[in-house]
Amino acid sequence: NFKVYEDIDNKDTLFAMDNKRRVGIGGDDKCGIFACLYMLEILPQVKVVFFSREECGCKGSTAIDKTFFADCRYLIQLDRRGSKDFIQTYWGNKTISHDFSSEIGNVKKKYKYKNQTGTVTDVMKLWNNKVGISCINLSCGYYQPHSDYEYISIKDLWHSIKFTEEIIHT
């Protein structure tokens, strides 16, 4: 009986119920997948990859053939909780080039994204495995991940999608 509901008081919020009990909505995966599928629809030049076992040590991204990214200028992962977090540093290691950072700086300011430090994620693993291009992770509108009170802000999800789209057009 798993169902997704729109909050009556805040129509921007989606949450899940199962047998009259709040449950996690799986927003960390669903928001990123939705954003990627949307990007494929409007920007046919983008490449999308979905990795398996990200939450079990990023096994899928660790095993990928790096030549898949040979024609890519950068990697954008939409798998960060909240809104407006721009992850380009993991444990003191930057995963973004100075040139790419300068190139998208005005777009980042326009959308009010702020640098934050990230934790283990696929783009961090790819950077560590010397994929050779800038790798960032962006907030995409889910909150309280992996809990029964997880929810999605539709407004924040669309904000991250528009930010990503503008980065791609830059």
Where are these regions (language model features)?
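Short glycine-rich, acidic/polar surface loops and turns
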Residues: 117-135
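Gly/Ser/Thr-rich active-site loops/lids in small-molecule metabolic enzymes
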Residues: 96-108, 156-164
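A gly/proline- and charged-residue-enriched helix-loop-helix capping module
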Residues: 13-23
